[in-house]
Structure formats: structure tokens, C-alpha cells
Curated annotation (Swiss-Prot):
Keyword Transmembrane helix appears in the UniProt entry: no
Keywords linked to the UniProt accession: Repressor, Transcription, Transcription regulation, Virulence
Alphabetical list of Pfam families matching this protein: EAL (PF00563)
Protein name as it appears in the record: Anti-FlhC(2)FlhD(4) factor YdiV
Domain of life where this protein originates: Bacteria
Function: Acts as an anti-FlhC(2)FlhD(4) factor by binding to FlhD, decreasing its ability to bind DNA, and thus negatively regulates expression of flagellar class II operons, decreasing motility in nutrient-poor medium. Required for resistance to host phagocyte oxidase.
Description of how the protein assembles with itself and partners: Interacts with FlhD in the FlhC(2)FlhD(4) heterohexamer, inhibiting its ability to activate transcription.
UniProt source species: Salmonella typhi
Gene3D superfamilies found in the cross-reference section: EAL domain
Family that this chain belongs to: Belongs to the YdiV family.
Every EAL domain range: 1-237
Amino acid sequence: MIASLDELYHSELFFLPVMDENARLVGLEIIATFAAEDGAVRMPTELVAPRLSVEEQYCLFVEKLALLETCQHFFIQHKLIAWLNLPPAISDLLLLDSELFSRAARFPFFEVAINENYPGLNQGKNNETLANLAMHFPLILANFGAGEASTKAIFDGLFKRVMLDKNFIQQRAEMISFEPFMHAIVAQISSSCESLMIAGIDTEAMFARAAPLGFSAFQGGLWPPVPVSQLIKLVQR
């Protein structure tokens, strides 16, 4: 996809691994970076997303689905989950555009990721769009702890999975209370979702600290994103 910002940028898609406590692959998040046409500048999606039009956000989501389609046998063969972040601006389109809905719903391993800044998230199941999304797709709250939402939507049972925010984890990791605080979160949240995951695992030392705490999966710089050409290497370790 080509995005028109101060200059033209094109999207490049990568797979961000999610591992279990034994460092075995359980799923992949499809993420995007944006590169200038001359390749001299690269920006992550979170910096570019606020400047994308609704049409550009739609095109990027479709581009991710197309990549997922080319890799679907890999996901099925290795029993992996695929996560795609859904921008709020196109959440209604996913439900109302029959072609887009069909493309997404055909993958049994596909789950929709949303962030804490999703409009009306604190309304929980009273948010009609969010409730409808949860009826049709497994949802994951991708950055719990970012500080932009309450726990209502989690306790309403809208999310199959919850991922703790990487910045939240890295800030807490510096505190002596990190382990008991994580135990408290696991105890509080686990009964309201199928899987509680943790991001911000950038080192072996951090992985060793987090692995015994009761989380089902881990994500971070310890397992960097890979292009589609290197997917097979993730299951050969």
C-alpha cells in the first residue's frame, strides 16, 4: 500500500512472533512498517496510523488479509493463531462490508486485535459495534495497561485474550513489586478470558522473570518480527 504523507511511503508487512513459556511459537501478529520510496526512512505503524485516511487504513487491513491468505496453510499446519489489529475507523466496515467480512471470517485461526483507545471501550458489552465484533470474531485486547481504558470490557467477557501493554510491563519491571503485582493481575483477569499474555519481553532475563508468573504467551524484542520468507525458521528452532 502507498501512503501519502509528507512524501510517499509504502507499507512492508512482517510477522511478530508470540511464544509460550517454552519459547515455542503459538501465534503471529501481522504488523506493518512504512518506508520512504528511497528506503532512507522507516516508520512503525503507530507513528503513521494517525495520519492515514480511512481508505488507507482499509487498504492496509486488506493487504494484511491478503498476506494471511497466502500463508494460511502454514498457520493451519502448525496450529498457529494470527492477529491483525483493527483500526476503529474501519470496525463498522468489517461488519457491514460483506466481502471484507467474508475474507476475514474464512480463517478459523484469525483473531481481531483492538487497542485500549478503541472508542467506547469502557462501555463494554453496551458498545454495540464492539459487542457485534465479539459475536463474529475472537477478540484480543492488545495493550491492556496502557492507561486508556477500564477493565469493564474484559469483565464483560468480550475478549478471548488479553495482552499486557509492553510499556506498562517495562515500567513495572523496574520495581521491586513487579512479581507480586503481576500475580495480582493474573488472579484478577484470568477468569474473564481464555488467555492472558504479556508483551515487553525483550531479554532472556525478562523472559525468565515472566515465565513463572502464569501468563500463557509472551511477545517482545527477544523474538523480533520476520518477513514472510523467514516464517518457516520460527518453527524449526
